[in-house]
Amino acid sequence: MTLQPPIPVLRIFDRALAKAFYVDWLGFRVDWEHRFEPGAPAYLQVARGPVVLHLSEHYGDCSPGAKVFVHTDDVEALHRELSSRPNRNMRPGVDIAPWNAKVLEVTDPFGNRLLFNQPLPAA
């Protein structure tokens, strides 16, 4: 048996706001979207490289305010990329975490947080 990486489900309230944040700003792509019928809440999968997230407008799927920890090998490159795309609500910086890593944290319009983490060499 082989376990695969988990796929976090994040609560969203507006598909257009979610797309603006995850696709237009963070650089994810929409892999697919599902609605049980026209006008029903959306459930979609977004991905960037190996990172896959599910975004749900469905009440009861999950609660807003989740935090997802994403490993990366170059937080500074991500910071430059995000800084090149205007976002009036987010201007994240790069910090050094107590666990000896460079981190960049962003918060989506629904209160969910993504923490991008780059471990630093041991001192």
Feature-to-residue mapping (PLM):
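Conserved short beta-strand elements that form part of the metal-binding/catalytic scaffold
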Residues: 30-66, 113-118
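A short acidic/small-residue loop/turn micro-motif
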Residues: 61, 98, 119-123
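Conserved catalytic-core motifs of GNAT/GCN5-like acyltransferases
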Residues: 9-11, 29-37, 95, 121-123
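Vicinal oxygen chelate
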Residues: 14-16, 68-113
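Structural motif
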Residues: 21, 25-26, 109
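Conserved acetyl-CoA-binding loop of GNAT-fold acetyltransferases
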Residues: 24-30, 86-88
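Short hydrophobic/aromatic beta-strand element in the GNAT-like acyltransferase core
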Residues: 9, 43, 52, 103-105
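N-terminal beta-strand motif that seeds the catalytic metal site of vicinal oxygen chelate
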Residues: 1-19, 66-68, 119-123
